């Protein structure tokens, strides 16, 4: 069912809340109690524990450097796909991650499937892993799986063996049916076995990573107990630290509580100077990015995630969003996003999942303004940027290369689209919610017309009349067609055939004009005189019973070169009706005269009602 077909009538199963209001609920809050089964769910402090950290320090921290990144698209992301990656798609993803600058890449769970095993062997045997890139392989804390993992990695230069077991209250009780002692022993036994087996593969630089899976559902004191025991077995040093990964396997709490738990571990873990503290946030509550940022401020050193937030359920934390959030704060993410469209295209191909239009930084619509006030602010912001490097210039008169080193300050655009390989063509799009700013921007950037501010309201009303009548969006071509129909193509009641202008030769002499016209279907020739070509033409039209008073005039070059064109805009009161006219021609003079004719026809065309300037 398409979105357009989805709403037929109000769904019968939705029950409008009519229950009692909360005790103490203020009178201005009209919400009512719902029939949702709230009694089935426990708050985090009851389900797990109430983490108390009154002297927390993370709220005062700032993110000033990027973390160590680890991309888990090829494992955690891949396992969540409807159609898991083929070997060819895995290669494409791996090559993309390397090209972007990731130095730690989780490449699979080689003991879990032959496909993953074969892929790990392929990238090792074909020399696809750069010397400064470390591959990471995932394995459960079981002996036969651990041995198979080492077999898969034989011959690799740098490998992180990532072993894990779940430590949460729920999984201990429901899945494994083990007590705390048994769960801890499972972890330490795996650590001892891994350390022993690694001795059989001396040519590889082995590093270790342990995750108390479902960390967010684990009491922090117990998580520390298990982690400390594993660290004691692996015996890391400050020169050769191990990674302790604290996964929000299921996001269960608000980001501030997650940050408290990270800071608690950061403060209390034994041998902290020999530990790289890592985060692995998921997005079940929709706050994975916030949790990662606050957790990083709370003492973490490293973050695992996926491009565009792929992963089980609602996905892993989005590394694109995290990294580009840092860029907007002047922090180098140490990853390259200069062609985000290519990155997105590759990810969509590999995952066979579309990146939503509203996904931060990468979606089709994230740099697009439809709202009139937003469009006006963006338009003015871009012009202000241009004026910084060339006083008085508009955004169409200054190249992006000239702006490249200028501080970015444009309302509603937290990042310059061109810094990530996007362009300005789709920054402003017009629908029924748009205003003069958006219309003016498109006419300026796409069609070279700098519509005067006082005319922008009039033309935006013309465009809005179309969107109100027809619905949907008005693209650039459609907008030009509307403009041409409204201002350039009218030939009734006056059509210009030929104009001969003689400019004044002295200060006290008038300009003169001879105008060959078709007026109400008849060929006519009229003469006029005035203190300039426009006044002379108005005088000529007066002889046809057309009273024209020029009230505002603007002009500019539309194009340059041998075929240069000029554009002129005239606000005129024609027989008591105030309208704008527009002319485009090879010279300013003839463009201006065309603009007067345009205004006359818009005011007097009985077959086509014009939008009047200023509502007159």
Curated annotation (Swiss-Prot):
Its main location: cytoplasm. It catalyses: 3-methyl-2-oxobutanoate + acetyl-CoA + H2O = (2S)-2-isopropylmalate + CoA + H(+). Mg(2+) binds at residues 76, 280, 282, 316. Residues 67-341 form the Pyruvate carboxyltransferase domain. Homodimer. HAMAP family: LeuA_type2. Catalyzes the condensation of the acetyl group of acetyl-CoA with 3-methyl-2-oxobutanoate (2-ketoisovalerate) to form 3-carboxy-3-hydroxy-4-methylpentanoate (2-isopropylmalate). Complements an E.coli leuA deletion. Residues 1-34 are annotated as: Disordered. Residues 490-616 are annotated as: Regulatory domain. It comes from the Bacteria. Belongs to the alpha-IPM synthase/homocitrate synthase family. LeuA type 2 subfamily. It is an enzyme of class 2 (transferase). Its cofactor is Mg(2+). One of its GO terms (biological process) is L-leucine biosynthetic process. CDD domains: DRE_TIM_LeuA. Keywords: Amino-acid biosynthesis, Branched-chain amino acid biosynthesis, Cytoplasm, Leucine biosynthesis, Magnesium, Metal-binding, Transferase. One of its GO terms (cellular component) is cytoplasm. This is 2-isopropylmalate synthase. Disulfide bonds: none annotated.
């Amino acid at each position: 069912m398409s979105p357009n077909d989805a709403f037929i009538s109000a769904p019968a199963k939705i029950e409008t809340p009519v229950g009692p209001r909360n005790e103490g609920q203020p009178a201005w809050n009209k919400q009512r109690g719902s029939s949702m089964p709230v009694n089935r769910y426990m708050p985090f402090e009851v389900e797990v524990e109430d983490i108390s950290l009154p002297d927390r320090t993370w709220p005062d921290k700032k993110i000033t450097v990027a973390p160590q990144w680890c991309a888990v698209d090829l494992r955690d992301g891949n396992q969540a796909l409807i159609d898991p990656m083929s070997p060819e798609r895995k290669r494409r993803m791996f090559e993309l991650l390397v090209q972007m600058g990731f130095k730690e890449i989780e490449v699979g769970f080689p003991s879990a499937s032959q496909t993953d095993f074969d892929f790990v062997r392929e990238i090792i045997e074909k020399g696809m892993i750069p010397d400064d890139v470390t591959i990471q392989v995932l394995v459960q804390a079981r002996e036969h799986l651990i041995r198979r993992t080492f077999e898969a990695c034989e011959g690799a230069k740098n490998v992180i063996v990532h072993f894990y077991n779940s430590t949460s209250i729920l999984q201990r009780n429901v899945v494994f049916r083990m007590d705390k002692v048994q769960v801890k022993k499972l972890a330490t036994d795996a650590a001892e076995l891994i350390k022993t087996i690694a001795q059989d593969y001396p040519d590889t630089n082995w590093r270790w990573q342990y995750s108390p899976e479902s960390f967010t559902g684990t009491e922090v004191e117990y998580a520390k107990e298990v982690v400390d025991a594993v660290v004691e077995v692996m015996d890391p040093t400050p020169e050769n630290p191990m990674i302790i990964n604290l996964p929000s396997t299921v996001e269960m709490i608000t980001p501030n509580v997650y940050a408290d738990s990270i800071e608690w571990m950061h403060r209390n873990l034994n041998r902290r100077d020999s530990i790289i503290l890592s985060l692995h946030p998921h997005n079940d509550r929709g706050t994975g990015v916030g949790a990662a940022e606050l957790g990083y401020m709370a003492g973490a050193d490293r973050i695992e995630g996926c491009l565009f937030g792929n992963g089980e359920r609602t996905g892993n934390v989005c590394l694109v969003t995290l990294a580009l959030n840092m860029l907007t704060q002047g922090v180098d993410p140490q990853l390259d996003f200069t062609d985000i469209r290519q990155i997105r295209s590759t990810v969509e191909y590999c995952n066979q999942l579309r990146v939503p239009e509203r996904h931060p930084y990468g979606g089709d619509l994230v740099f697009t303004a439809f709202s009139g006030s937003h469009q006006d602010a963006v338009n003015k912001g871009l012009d202000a940027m241009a004026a910084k490097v060339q006083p008085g210039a508009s955004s169409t008169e200054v190249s992006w290369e000239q702006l490249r080193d200028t501080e970015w300050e444009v309302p509603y655009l937290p990042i310059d689209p061109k810094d990530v390989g996007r362009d300005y063509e789709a920054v402003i799009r017009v629908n029924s919610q748009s205003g003069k700013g958006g219309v003016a921007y498109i006419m300026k950037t796409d069609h070279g017309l700098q519509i005067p501010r006082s005319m922008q309201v009039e033309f935006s009303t013309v465009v809005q009349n179309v969107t109100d009548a027809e619905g949907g969006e008005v693209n650039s071509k459609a907008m030009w067609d509307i403009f041409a129909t409204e201002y350039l193509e009218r030939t009734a009641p006056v059509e210009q055939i030929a104009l001969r202008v003689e400019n004044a030769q002295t200060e006290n002499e008038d300009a003169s004009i001879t105008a060959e016209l078709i007026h109400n279907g008849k060929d006519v020739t009229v003469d006029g005189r005035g203190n300039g070509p426009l006044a002379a033409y108005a005088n000529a039209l007066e002889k046809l019973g057309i009273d024209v008073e020029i009230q505002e005039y603007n002009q500019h070059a539309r194009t340059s070169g041998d075929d240069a064109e000029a554009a002129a805009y005239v606000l005129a009161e024609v027989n008591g009706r105030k309208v704008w006219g527009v002319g485009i021609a090879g010279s300013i003079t003839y463009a201006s005269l065309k603009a007067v004719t345009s205004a006359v026809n818009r005011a007097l065309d009985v077959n086509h009602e014009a939008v009047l300037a200023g509502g007159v």
